[in-house]
UniProtKB/Swiss-Prot annotation:
Optimum temperature is 30 degrees Celsius. The gene is rpg16. It is found in: Secreted. It catalyses: [(1->4)-alpha-D-galacturonosyl](n) + H2O = alpha-D-galacturonate + [(1->4)-alpha-D-galacturonosyl](n-1). It is an enzyme of class 3 (hydrolase). Glycans are attached at N143, N161, N164, N180, N218, N226, N256, N282, N343, N359, N365. Belongs to the glycosyl hydrolase 28 family. InterPro entries: Glyco_hydro_28, Pectin_lyas_fold, Pectin_lyase_fold/virulence. GO terms for cellular component: extracellular region. This is Exopolygalacturonase rpg16. Keywords: Cell wall biogenesis/degradation, Disulfide bond, Glycoprotein, Glycosidase, Hydrolase, Repeat, Secreted, Signal. Optimum pH is 4.0.
Amino acid sequence: MVRFTSFTSPFSAILLLSFGINKVATASTNTCVVAKSDSDDAITILEAFEKCKTGGTVVFPKDSTYNLNSIVTTSGLKNVNINLAGTINLPVREESYRNGDYYIQIKGTNIKMYGGGTINGNGQAWWDALDRTAPSVLRIAANDSSFGNFNIINSPRAHLNVTNSTNLLLHDFIIHTVSNNSNPAKNTDALDLYHSSGVIFRDSDLTIGDDCLAVKENVTKVTVSNITCRGGHGYSIGSLGMGGRRDFVTQVNVYNSTCIDCQNGVRVKTWAGGKGFVEDINFTDIYLEKAENPIIITTHYCDKNEMGYCNNNYETSLDIAGVHFKNIHGSGSDKGKPIINLNCSTESPCSDVTLTNINISKASNNTKNVCVNLKGSDKIPECSS
């Protein structure tokens, strides 16, 4: 049951996104406080969204806890505020959720989600079962919208999955997903981006088991800043081109961010045989601490969970051009990997790749830097060290 009230706000709340002047959320005319259900709080959550889907505010009150036993799918939201001040617990692992896309979907235009609350993914059972088929926690498909100032913990897979979105601000997240035993929290990306344009991700603290950022197929105009990531797989473009797919990523700027004890630091990864292009990528002012692979481009990425798409055709992949690494500093790990590993394809070599002011301390066993099929590598000092 939803407690439903009406009021007239004296003003409109307008958020000016730094990539434009788009309005995010407007004055609400209705407030829907999500009630508790006797069986499945997904039912009352959906009821609240239905009543307040146009010009309303959906409220999860502070100190309230909601337990889901089914998927929450919203669509057609317009001018909606979501005040998540309470806690949402996702379902425990069940066969019916395997290979699902998401647990919660928020879809619409001019949405603002905030509140300081928490979504708990209950991921431990998935990690203990070594099951990597869990859904993402939160899928966002939204235009001219803002999501932030709430927490996501114990995600069974990706925390934030953004698709088919434009002019989107993601900010002030605390994301914390760590296993309580020896079974690692694998495939728990903080943010996956697909088919989107004009996305800002900033001012967030991440402790995860996979990519801090994964900019995937058909994405353009992304800005990432002031992120601290711990224990993850770094800031990644890709993976792209799996199974010969045609993908593109352009105009991505990642700056003023940190990766501590990360497997990778800053990375571009594409599959052999993939088609499309990657261009205008900038990693600037990045601090890496004990990164196993601090700076890496690979055009023959292979995920051992997708071996059917792995092949030995290293001759072609996506065209990679205009990737710039600037002011990257910190330290490499003692795993014996090269500090810089730029390994491109024979028939589609990388071009216009620059390394400027790279200052990453080596361990005693770091191997020589790698620059393969990289146009202009003879003019890059790091390629000869």
